[in-house]
A protein has these predicted regions:
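P-loop NTP-binding/switch modules centered on Walker-like glycine-rich loops
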Residues: 1-73
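Short catalytic/signature loops enriched in Gly
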Residues: 45-143
Length: 143
C-alpha cells in the first residue's frame, strides 16, 4: 500500500482500490464508494462514510470490523445471501437482507439522497417520509 501511495503522489494520479478490507481502505482512501450488487449504495469522503454511515449495508460492513466486536467471541455478519444478478430483484437488491427495509424497498430502487455536498446514500430511510430509526452505529438515519 505504501508503494501505491508513493506512485500516486509521484505521478499525481488517483488510485481505485477495490477491497472488502475496510481497514486498508480507511488508511489509504480520500473518498469511499460502497457497492452492493454492482451498484454504488453510499459515497462520500472516507471520514463521512466511516464516521457517519447512512446505508444499512454500510452499517453491516462497519459492524463486521474487529474494532466493533468489543470483546465478543465472533464478528458481526450480515444475514442472508446476496441476490443472484442473473435475475436481479425488483427494488433495492439489499432489501431481503436489510432488517430496516421498508415496503418500497421491495418495489423501487431508491435514488441517491444527498446528505452533504460530498456524501450520498441510496436508501429509502433517508426519504423525509420514512420512519425515523436509530442507526446501529449511533445517531439517527435521516437527512
Amino acid at each position: 500500500m505504501d508503494l501505491l501511495r508513493e506512485i500516486q503522489m509521484k505521478l499525481g494520479t488517483a488510485t481505485i482500490l477495490v477491497s472488502h478490507d475496510l481497514g486498508v481502505v480507511a488508511r489509504v482512501a480520500d473518498r469511499v464508494a460502497v457497492m452492493y450488487a454492482g451498484k454504488i449504495v453510499e459515497i462520500g469522503t472516507a471520514e463521512e462514510v466511516y464516521y457517519d454511515p447512512r446505508h444499512p449495508y454500510t452499517w453491516g460492513l462497519m459492524r463486521s470490523l474487529p474494532a466493533f466486536a468489543n470483546g465478543k467471541e465472533s464478528l458481526y455478519t450480515i444475514s442472508g445471501m446476496p441476490p443472484t444478478l442473473i435475475n436481479p430483484p425488483v427494488g433495492d437488491a439489499f432489501a431481503c437482507r436489510n432488517k430496516y427495509a421498508l415496503n418500497i424497498d421491495y418495489e423501487e430502487m431508491p435514488p441517491m439522497f444527498k446528505i452533504t455536498d460530498t456524501h450520498y446514500a441510496a436508501t429509502w430511510l433517508l426519504d423525509p417520509r420514512a420512519p425515523q430509526i436509530k442507526s446501529p452505529m449511533g445517531g439517527q438515519c435521516s437527512e
